[in-house]
UniProtKB/Swiss-Prot annotation:
Residues 785-1038 form the Protein kinase domain. It catalyses: O-phospho-L-seryl-[protein] + H2O = L-seryl-[protein] + phosphate; O-phospho-L-threonyl-[protein] + H2O = L-threonyl-[protein] + phosphate. InterPro entries: cNMP-bd_dom, cNMP-bd_dom_sf, Kinase-like_dom_sf, PP2C_BS, PPM-type-like_dom_sf, PPM-type_phosphatase-like_dom, Prot_kinase_dom, RmlC-like_jellyroll. Mn(2+) 2 binds at D148, D344, D388. The keyword Repeat applies. This is Protein phosphatase 2C and cyclic nucleotide-binding/kinase domain-containing protein. The protein kinase domain is predicted to be catalytically inactive. Residues 107-397 form the PPM-type phosphatase domain. Mn(2+) 1 binds at D148, G149. A nucleoside 3',5'-cyclic phosphate 2 binds at residues 617-758. Its EC number is 3.1.3.16. One of its GO terms (molecular function) is ATP binding. The lineage of its organism: Eukaryota, Viridiplantae, Streptophyta, Embryophyta, Tracheophyta. In the N-terminal section; belongs to the PP2C family. In the C-terminal section; belongs to the protein kinase superfamily. AGC Ser/Thr protein kinase family.
Amino acid sequence: MGCAYSKTCIGQICATKENSIRQTHQQAPSRGGTRATAAAAAVEEDNPVFNFSSDAVDDVDNDEIHQLGLSRDQEWGITRLSRVSSQFLPPDGSRVVKVPSCNYELRCSFLSQRGYYPDALDKANQDSFAIHTPFGSNSDDHFFGVFDGHGEFGAQCSQFVKRRLCENLLRHGRFRVDPAEACNSAFLTTNSQLHADLVDDSMSGTTAITVMVRGRTIYVANAGDSRAVLAEKRDGDLVAVDLSIDQTPFRPDELERVKLCGARVLTLDQIEGLKNPDVQCWGTEEDDDGDPPRLWVPNGMYPGTAFTRSIGDSIAETIGVVANPEIAVVELTPDNPFFVVASDGVFEFISSQTVVDMVAKHKDPRDACAAIVAESYRLWLQYETRTDDITIIVVHIDGLKDDAPRQLSSTGTQLQPPIPQVVELTGSESPSTFGWNSKNQRVRHDLSRARIRAIENSLENGHAWVPPSPAHRKTWEEEAHIERVLRDHFLFRKLTDSQCQVLLDCMQRLEANPGDIVVKQGGEGDCFYVVGSGEFEVLATQDGKNGEVPRILQRYTAEKQSSFGELALMHNKPLQASVRAVDHGTLWALKREDFRGILMSEFSNLASLKLLRSVDLLSRLTILQLSHVAESLSEACFSDGQTIVTKDQKLQGLYVIQKGRVKISFCTEVLESQNVSSLTTGITNEYDNLEIGTEVSIEKHEGSYFGEWALLGELKDSLSVVAVGEVVCVVLTKENFESAVGPLTNISDDGPKTRHSSFELSKESAKVTDTTALAKATLADLEWTTCLSTTDCSEIGLVHLKDKENLLSLKRFSKQKVKKLGKEAQVLKERNLMKNVIKPSAIVPEILCTCVDQTFAAILLNTTLACPISSLLHSPLDESSVRFITGSLVSAIEDIHKNEILFRGSSPELLMLDQSGYLQIVDFRFAKKLSGERTFTICGNADYLAPEIVQGKGHGYAADWWALGVLIYYMLEGEMPFGSWRESELDTFQKIAKGQLTFPRVLSSEAEDLITKLLEVDENLRFGSQGGPESIKKHPWFNGLKWEAISNREFQVPQEIISRIHHHLENDNVLPLETSKSLDTTEDQDAQNWLEEW
């Protein structure tokens, strides 16, 4: 159900839906007469103005675009808004316009960069912007706006709103006397017009942030999560004052409002069942992984918006995503040097204060825009696998005096409902202290899960970007010249020394002859250039009064340390000018591909991660933790014979050798410690019988390490280290380590060694044949050896009886976490299904016993598990391997359905393999007993949900066959068939609902046919629904597969699966273990109650 007042429901003030629609229709102009009436009202005067918009369709390229006179029917200025200038910014990069009534100037610049989407390299920039100076007929009015589109038709929506919003604002009858009311009305009218337009805004729309300057007063209107920020001088500091507060579910007031309108507010983890949907799990310091709360209709998996207000989004509007803007009215003072308007792509990883600090470092707004966009771009690639579209406008306020006329009275403009969200400020009061109870969310500083997966793949597979071999060996002078040019360049300022060296190696030498065109206006460049010698001129053909006029805008020389083309490193937007060689010269070129490779693969950081992973003491850290540690490393260089540590010093940190070798001398008594594995590995058999106190010398080479004991606070003396040849080390001190990830506890020796030995044992171990002895086993009888997989409240690992060697698998639930998450009923349901309903088979292992202790409730399984299927999918599997896994799963689902159970667990994270390579199903958390009815419960891995689940229509057994199709596609292609919900949820929703399917890799025709039939949108026609599981088994793709042999575990497991399991067990880290020491072991009566049935 939706909210009847959702179009005007703001805070505690609501107007009826009928009144809202009536008011909007009265204000909406007739579509057909807009242009004709506006054209008739055009009267040219002599005042030059600047109008810039992000679309260049029908643009007029002219230095003198004349403002229009006022007409009685309020149509003045409309025509001019569609005739925007595409001319270039002047050489200083900014536009200057006067505000005559207050005798000051606005100096502005802008930059809009299309995002980088690896799976959609040609995706349009969905951001748009508008700058109109002046705005309308009054030279005191100036308009700046940023519009961030989203959804399949987001680009069209943002362009539509950019044009219509300005028109509606100028047309409003109270624009001259009450700009705040006019802004509110313009947003609502534009929203209604977008609904009525041919553009499909059902699952698409745009956020909007606009700033209108009138004299010394600015009116800020915001709908969404873009932002406007004002700089203010306070006590010698420059402080960021947020003029808008992001409208997202992070705000308690917005969260409550959309819930009253019928929205479900959940993160993707909650949607997928990884976290309790009844517990608010966002807004804490721990939740910084790019999984924000989103809005969903009551019984559907859409629309999934992460904001609570926007223009368009007609479906989201039914659950409270309204177009009503929040409006702030602020009076400028001489203490306000500039303001910034930007899309949320800027503020995802950069705070408002950081933006203000960066702008303050640049005299020219253009340079500030470029610096902020480049830093945003860099941070997106550091923490994500893609970047958002990024748009920014910077406006400097020059020459404003205290004696300038004031336009607000001391009491401010009094505004009545239905426009309550108006904040009026004077001086230094910010919205957050003037009745705004919310603050903008802190920026993200953790890697996204997609980024973590990409790093893991790079570490496992070696698919990291590799720099090209330089065709020309640079001289010392050439490298020094390039370094001087790049030293203070905004785009390269944050690169590490190692990255800078790689960048130097990537720059290729180009020779240019007089008259050669290096880059051509209108073309697409992909290189950044540093001028090595010679002279180059910048040419642009611009429209003048007498037609096209070529102009020389600038000259580049090596003496000026010139460079150009930096924006080509970030996008392929058509070039605004040509560059031509005046005489013979040389250029150093850096390709976009190489620049992006340096940033995305984090070349030096990836090497650091590999080095850190080799340290036994750090082997249990996650990729995210290792990444934080890698950022804390420092580099130290030593010459041949230089002493790194003397015997009277104590080593202060971990040293990892990147280059060269070192000689370490120490007394054998040092080896008595458990945490000196780096020294013991270098000791040969001849030293085994040496007496305590004997001095030993060993050598450590590139890739080795020493000093790990210092991370635990152990200080060893009687040890010296000397460089042999030139040596480069990275150093990690205890203080830096603990600052990055916290204290490192002393890890015992049951980690990787146990994991490896368990694999060796598994070759001989088989299922327990005599199960009677284990029927009454307790957790005290079992010894936990290895953790294989974890969820929010459980973990699966290997155990053995303390007097036996046979390895078994244990699924244990943390009693404390189950209670905290409110999952008692879910856990009991899963246990009952596994123990009492589902019959054991070759694929569903037998339950040997269930047991409980003070900390855990556990299920002992008669199988020796190896890993989840996801651990093997660092690259696509071959078809024979996928066929084997799929055949096993089809047999299992067939048996599960016979027991009237809907599985909903066909994802590689939930499905396990045993150490023989056979599929094992041990996770039934999403399973449900059906009795012929449909279920409307939404759960399961979001990427595997069927269209009927996404659309909230209810679902049955056919949903399992859809998920099977998704799984087959993923195992063969290495990517999801409809994109990942974590990267573009709206696009994925629509693709699932429409069944839009493509095959990037060439598969067999049989495989494509089976996948296509399983991924049929109509569940009645879906393979498996018609003809049952037998129709799937008889598909030609399964020809040669012996179903009975699979059921009897007699089918030969494909070698590809065996080899990948071997590789995983030999090389991958075990997961961090949950021990009883980390949990509250206090007995809880409630816990005992729900466990009585265990």
